[in-house]
Curated annotation (Swiss-Prot):
It comes from Streptomyces antibioticus. The lineage of its organism: Bacteria, Bacillati, Actinomycetota, Actinomycetes, Kitasatosporales. The chain crosses the membrane at residues 27-47, 62-82, 91-111, 150-170, 194-214. Its main location: membrane. Belongs to the binding-protein-dependent transport system permease family. MalFG subfamily. Keywords: Cell membrane, Membrane, Transmembrane, Transmembrane helix, Transport. This is Putative ABC transporter permease protein ORF1. Pfam families: BPD_transp_1.
């Protein structure tokens, strides 16, 4: 514990680099990535878990195989696609890349949670007159809350910490995310360890805060499932 705590390094870090604006960019990208990933992965994972068709098995195989290839191999095709869509140097384009990156693992995780939901609950809802959409939203999704929270956490942390794609796809300084701006502390004369360390420490706080926000949902959902079983 330092004998004389001071915020001088924090003030110096904010004075040297636009950390606040970069953190806002990262927060917008991470929240959008988490939201879109959950919205896409939840119904897809439900279909993969409940319908044992060839298409569902093919989708499951694609999820497994896609994890075997380094995502960096796709940077050139992604760059060309985003260039054609005029999404280079755009936070929207970066969100699309992160969603594509997060989806395979999110599908795999949520499909496992969906398989653990008893089919009898959905059958009971169908007997009561609920359709598939109503059953999904009113019965299945609440039981998938722990998996959805874990998926959102994974997508958020992935987007918040990612550096390579943000470096390649974002050129304008006012659109750069926090991991990219942190590298600006590195100069020809070395790294000013005090302000750089303070900035790096502050960069970890949003991920910890998001985890603290969703961890109760994850824990309570797991305990609820254990009691029901």
């Amino acid at each position: 514990i330092p004998r004389h705590p001071t915020l001088a390094n924090v003030r110096q870090a904010f004075a040297e680099q636009p950390l606040a604006h970069a953190a806002l960019n990262s927060l917008l990208v991470a929240l959008a990535t988490a939201a879109v990933t959950v919205l896409i992965a939840t119904p897809m994972a439900y279909v993969m878990a409940r319908h044992r068709t060839k298409a569902a098995r093919a989708a499951t195989g694609w999820v497994v195989v896609s994890q075997a290839f380094p995502f960096v191999l796709l940077i050139i095709p992604l760059f060309l696609v985003l260039k054609r869509l005029r999404l280079i140097d755009s936070l929207t384009g970066l969100v699309l890349v992160y969603v594509v990156w997060s989806l395979p693992f999110a599908l795999w995780m949520l499909a496992g949670h969906a398989r653990a939901v008893p089919a009898e609950l959905e059958e009971a809802a169908a007997v009561d007159g609920a359709g598939r959409v109503r059953t999904l939203t009113s019965v299945t999704v609440p039981l998938l809350a722990p998996g959805i929270a874990a998926t959102a956490l994974f997508a958020f942390v992935t987007a918040w910490n990612e550096f390579f794609f943000a470096l390649v796809l974002l050129k304008s300084p006012h659109r750069q995310t926090l991991p990219v701006v942190l590298t600006h502390f590195i100069g020809a004369e070395g790294v000013p360890t005090s302000p750089a360390g303070a900035a790096a420490f502050l960069a970890t706080l949003p991920s910890l805060a998001f985890f603290a926000l969703v961890q109760r949902r994850i824990t309570s959902g797991l305990l609820t499932g254990a009691v029901k079983n």
